From Swiss-Prot:
Compartment(s) of residence: Cytoplasm; Nucleus
Gene label: ely5
Any one GO BP annotation for this protein: nuclear pore complex assembly
InterPro entries xref list: ELYS_dom
Name this protein carries in UniProt: Uncharacterized protein ely5
Disulfide bonds, paired cysteine numbers: none
Amino acid sequence: MLKMEDDQFERFVGLFSMKDEDFPYNSQVTNEIQTFRKQQVDSQLFFDVLLSFIEGIEDPSSLYPPKSIDDLQSLFMIIENSNIDELKQQCFYYYLLKDWEKSETYSEQVSLPKNYQHLMDGYYYLDRLKFEEAINHLLLPDVLPNFPDKIIETLYSNEKYKFLIRFVSFVGPPLDTFRKEECYALSLVRYSFLASYHYMKKCTKPLVLWEEMIQLILESNDTQSCKLIVSLPLSQEECEVLFSLLRSKKEPLYLNTLLALLVESNNIQEALELSSNSTHLQKSAVNTYLHKLNSLSS
């Protein structure tokens, strides 16, 4: 451990405590933090990523959570002697002091700007997979999250699709990779197929997203979106992908949508052949309409 000067020791004691009974990182808390770390998409806490900006830190996970007061002093000295500015140091201490339930008092003592408090609160709650609390802090005015890629991936991998949509809509991070486009489109499609479809058309790999969107709504048995698909002015490539997927299974929603699509595209003969070979389709409303349509054209 680096040797502390007297003024540094006073600051340390003023921030934390030298009493063992005050030390919050017991085995239960330590295990919880390590579990949260393993559940992160890249096995890194947001605090790990922040610590990695300090020159010389190669393994942030070995520093947090500290296993003893000596370890905490070592982390304190690394931050104190680091190449980062005072405001960033205060942000690190604010995050650590949340574990000690002293962060609010500290922020008042050093006049830590509110937007930085909310930013660190957001990261703290993301690290603990408390997504609603995290988003409520990260979407406040003047808060500028600086790890949008990790935030998007974290929300998507934890199936927090509404929060992801809110984050993208409010913060407006550049969706400049296919993975980010994919996370957003496949979140959006769960709530608005039409909005997701229009977004998909502007993406770098629209047909790949189109196939993923169709698979998702079919697998989730989203009948309303399937009805909407049939009425869309699809391109030839989109139609080919759609027909291929619909013909891949004999499940009811696949068959219903395929029959409706064949009727809509005026492929009456193929629609009649499909319905005649399916007991399920013979009972459908689309089949009744199909036979009326066929009798009128005969």
